[in-house]
């Protein structure tokens, strides 16, 4: 249990950041899910549009520290490869 005022404030800040990060992570997952649906349906146009929405969202999450930048880059790369395979 936090006893000092600074420790209590740190607990409040951590709780607030956790909520923000949860929201960002959920938003990324939603965008990825939409892309997955487009890929599974085989809709090239929808997949490209969804990918263009997913990429900046993932990179934004990386820049905010929600996911590691290498993790975001890896996910973007794998999704791009799947979108490209759909177009081939």
Swiss-Prot record:
Single GO MF descriptor: small ribosomal subunit rRNA binding
GO cellular component terms listed in the entry, alphabetical order: small ribosomal subunit
Pfam families to which the protein is assigned, alphabetical: Ribosomal_S20p
Biological-process GO terms, alphabetical: translation
InterPro entries noted in UniProt: Ribosomal_bS20, Ribosomal_bS20_sf
Matches recorded under SUPFAM superfamilies: Ribosomal protein S20
Keywords linked to the UniProt accession: Ribonucleoprotein, Ribosomal protein, RNA-binding, rRNA-binding
Recorded superkingdom: Bacteria
Family of the protein in this entry: Belongs to the bacterial ribosomal protein bS20 family.
Function: Binds directly to 16S ribosomal RNA.
Protein name according to UniProt: Small ribosomal subunit protein bS20
Lineage: Bacteria, Pseudomonadati, Pseudomonadota, Alphaproteobacteria, Hyphomicrobiales
Protein's gene: rpsT
């Amino acid at each position: 249990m936090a006893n000092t005022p600074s420790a209590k404030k740190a607990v409040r800040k951590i709780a607030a950041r956790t909520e923000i990060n949860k929201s960002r992570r959920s938003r990324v997952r939603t965008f990825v899910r939409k892309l997955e649906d487009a890929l599974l349906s085989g809709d090239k146009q929808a997949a490209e549009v969804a990918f263009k929405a997913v990429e900046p969202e993932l990179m934004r999450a990386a820049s905010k520290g929600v996911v590691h930048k290498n993790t975001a880059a890896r996910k973007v790369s794998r999704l791009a490869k799947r979108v490209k395979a759909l177009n081939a």
